[in-house]
Regions:
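Extracellular glycan-interacting surfaces
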Residues: 1-234
Length: 234
């Protein structure tokens, strides 16, 4: 599958990089996490150039990977890299804005198997700094969840922070800050039975499921999305 993408002048201007018909820029897809419930598959990632991340991507399939749709609008200058579904209906995707530095971490939440999503910021309006990226995300129930935020790129003296949510990701509060890396207690790795793997020969991301000691491929997504060629203004 090739995720459709057409570069616009607004994309180039907002990201602050140069692409023209004379010097086009290659555009790539990166997929970082995957999970599934029954025949419903989900993957997340971003669309980027060599220089900058352009958009987040959230893809879903309702037929075991045979066909795919984008199930959330792309978020400009952002990426998604965490994904969890607790049951067939309840799920979360975590990410952040990535330009010019990782900032404004957020969680997307759904209660209807990905048909609708709500975007909720992790940092409160009173947070003195907006920089940070989600390093870990886990929900132990439909209500209780946590994220670890790394704020080191923003120059924070105590860069690691634990935020918890008591209402399924609708709101978040700061619980701990530390100069040393923090980890969510009892949180497993991202779905150990599903993964995205780069196949260099095929230039594709493969969605794979663990079955015993083997990995079975269910879908392939092209890394290359074409060239960004923005004509000069007239």
């Amino acid at each position: 599958m090739v995720v459709p993408f057409e570069c616009t002048a607004e994309d180039v201007q907002s990201a602050g990089f140069s692409c023209s018909e004379e010097a086009p820029c290659p555009i790539y897809l990166e997929l970082s996490a995957a999970t599934a419930k029954g025949n419903k598959y989900y993957v997340v990632g971003n669309i980027h150039s060599d220089a900058v991340t352009l958009y987040s991507v959230l893809l879903g399939s309702e037929d075991a990977g045979a066909t795919w749709q984008e199930i959330h609008p792309r978020i400009r200058l952002s990426g998604l890299d965490h994904l969890q579904f607790l049951d067939a209906d309840t799920g979360w995707a975590g990410g952040q804005q990535l330009f010019p530095l990782p900032q404004e971490p957020f969680v997307l939440l759904t209660s209807d198997a990905g048909k609708n999503w709500r975007q909720q910021p992790v940092l409160g309006e009173d947070a003195d700094k907006r920089y940070g990226s989600i390093q870990e995300m886990h929900f132990s129930s439909k209500t209780d969840g946590g994220v670890i935020i790394d704020r080191s790129q923003g120059g924070d003296a105590g860069p690691f922070a634990l935020y918890e949510s008591p209402d399924g990701g609708a709101s978040w509060s700061l619980k701990e800050q530390n100069a040393k890396p923090l980890h969510l207690k009892g949180a497993p790795d991202q779905d150990a039975d599903w993964r995205m793997r780069v196949d260099p020969g095929a230039k594709a991301f493969l969605l794979e499921e663990r079955r015993g000691e083997r990995w079975i491929s269910h879908a392939a997504f092209s890394v290359n999305l074409g060239m960004c060629k923005v004509p000069p203004p007239r």
